[in-house]
Amino acid sequence: MTQQELTLYNLGENLDQLMNLDPRGYGVCRILYPAARALAKEPLTIHGAKFLVSNIKGGELVYIITGFVLLPFKKAEMDGIVSSVLLARSLIKAFGAKPVLICPEENLKAAKALTSVAGMHCYESVEEVQQFPISM
């Protein structure tokens, strides 16, 4: 194993462990992660990053599906929206991608506000996203 391979492996292991923290004790990640890891044969974060690097081309649309409504409160969750907007910005900067965020209506207000904070423009149509730079 080269130094670069070891670094990627360790980085992926650390990120995977961080993302599998289960402070509420639901246990779902502990059930699903081993099967996904066995299929990928490497840390899932590294596997996903390699997939993005291999498949995203400049100017292409990338669909990001995120968000859900917390029942019975009928309030939108926020961590997925924040992460998705930051992912969109990263895909624009790294690849020149054209991200399209798909989320429940309850998440739209937050998504639009976060888009501005992340230095992007938010449009209602895919055509506008394709036309204008740094947009989502």
Which residue ranges define each predicted feature?
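A glycine-rich helix N-cap at a beta->alpha junction
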Residues: 115-136
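Fold-independent oxyanion-binding glycine-rich loops
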Residues: 66-68, 104-105, 134
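Histidine-anchored nucleotide/phosphate-binding helix
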Residues: 77-96
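Short, glycine-rich nucleotide/cofactor-binding loops
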Residues: 36-41, 61-62, 66-83
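Short, charged/polar "capping" segments at the starts of alpha-helices
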Residues: 106-113
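Short internal beta-strands
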Residues: 98-106
